[in-house]
Amino acid sequence: MSETPLIDAMLAEHAELEKQLADPALHADAAAARKAGRRFAMLSPIVATHRKLATARDDLATARELSADDPSFADEVTELESSIAELETQLSDMLAPRDPHDGDDILLEVKSGEGGEESALFAADLARMYIRYAERHGWKVTVLDETESDLGGYKDATLAIASKGDSADGVWSRLKFEGGVHRVQRVPVTESQGRVHTSAAGVLVYPEPEEVEEIQIDESDLRIDVYRSSGKGGQGVNTTDSAVRITHLPTGIVVTCQNERSQLQNKARAMQVLAARLQALAEEQAQADASAGRASQIRTVDRSERIRTYNFPENRITDHRVGFKAHNLDQVLDGDLDALFDALAAADRKARLQEA
């Protein structure tokens, strides 16, 4: 990878962003300031590593000159050569193509699949797992919509998960690998003979656009229905037609939101979800030819196609994409997911380096 032109462009962009962020006028537009802050946070480690590398190279040149006259500098030359090799590897890793959405917040949908009531209960377990993980990281979780099963599981649920600051590695960078079919093996609460059953639930994850206006949505393409809420949105729920269902006619995408207190708030939230799904659809279509080999999120919840298995009798979790296995399923379901996510991120980083 040739780093010089790319680094020069990044140094210039970093300097320009530093000026912009110091200008109070930028912060009058919260969305623009946040976008600039995230980009600045992404570039800062690259700039810092490049500066360390440049300094080390200068020091090496000086040490080599001195060692020609004084052999005592030979050890310093060796140390600097080792340090430079390490910094070059770090910089090469940083310059690998990044996911442009890594700093974004997300919308996450959990849907029950085959397995009836047991699948719905497992879908609720998954939703709680993500909520616990978000709480561990200090992120904000909002339940936008939920449809409960008879036993308190989730037929489907939509969560908005947002970080509370500007970071190059935001919510999407950690949870983007969760899209797909999750399989569970356990004895259902409805099983009287103690037999282990297999069922599945599906997860869809979308990066959330900074503003709905960033995504072109023609109002004439929408059918908007209102109905009485059935969720837990607090005062006003079940007394007025505050829930909103939006159907995007060209794609058939249907979005519902009922947990906000007013119809206006629910419509705004539903439009956010729709914008995220349309953005993801457009990007998926644009990348279909260029990245045909990369796995996409599985939109049909089929037990035969899965990314991960949760085996309760053996307290084992297995991610089939990277061969990750751990016997701490109880902790994982309580939000202890970092070891798994680190393994997935490492595999993704390796693939991006190979592409570069």
UniProtKB/Swiss-Prot annotation:
The modification N5-methylglutamine is found at Q235. The keyword Transferase does not apply. One of its GO terms (cellular component) is cytoplasm. Its main location: cytoplasm. Methylated by PrmC. Methylation increases the termination efficiency of RF1. Keywords: Cytoplasm, Methylation, Protein biosynthesis. It is found in: Cytoplasm. GO terms for molecular function: translation release factor activity, codon specific. Belongs to the prokaryotic/mitochondrial release factor family. Peptide chain release factor 1 directs the termination of translation in response to the peptide chain termination codons UAG and UAA. This is Peptide chain release factor 1. It comes from Mycobacteroides abscessus (strain ATCC 19977 / DSM 44196 / CCUG 20993 / CIP 104536 / JCM 13569 / NCTC 13031 / TMC 1543 / L948) (Mycobacterium abscessus).
